[in-house]
């Protein structure tokens, strides 16, 4: 009798184990189907630089004093942010160190930062336009930002130390290979974008010709407060 009971108990345990395995497989299959449906049915992110689109990610190196370090734009945004929530707005400034308009705008950029830098994250993307005489370098980017002596700014027509404005105390991002410029369909420099904390383009200077970026930031930030 004991032997028979042992056999029956063993068989019962085996059936129980089989049931648990089958149940686990079934649940896993259901979860897989759900995840696939969510992935297929979820609308893809509308990525671009027009107002209302999610700004393309930026992966490069940034200089904020000291040494260059890895940088990724999406590390600075909150995809879960919604209107009314607290969050960091982002101001992207596209320049070329050989661009005379960018050089002359140095004072305005300092003014924007002095006015909004405590509430808005500033990032300058330093690219190289495909124009004769435009040949920059990481050294020139650093000297443009920090106002170091370097006669290479403004297509070798000006010293970086004489750039209008103060040294810029925010990160400068390397785009000498023009990857970011291509992703952003850069129309020229200077070019500006204001992003809401979730990375959505709230203001595009190309869509608002003649509007001062500082006035735009003031208007949008005031409306979102």
Question: Which residue stretches match the model-derived regions?
Answer:
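A short beta-strand-turn-helix
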Residues: 59-90, 114
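Thiol/disulfide oxidoreductase modules built on the thioredoxin-like
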Residues: 87, 164-169, 174-221
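PAS/PAS-like sensory domain loop/N-cap motif
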Residues: 74-76, 99, 199
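Structural microenvironment flanking redox-active thiols in thiol-disulfide oxidoreductases
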Residues: 103-163, 176-183
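The canonical Cys-X-X-Cys-His
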Residues: 99-103, 192
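N-terminal targeting signals for export/organelle localization
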Residues: 1-71, 225
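Conserved beta-strand and immediately adjacent loop positions that scaffold enzyme active sites
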Residues: 57, 91, 191
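Short pre-active-site segment immediately N-terminal to redox-active cysteine/selenocysteine motifs
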Residues: 87-90, 95-98, 129, 188
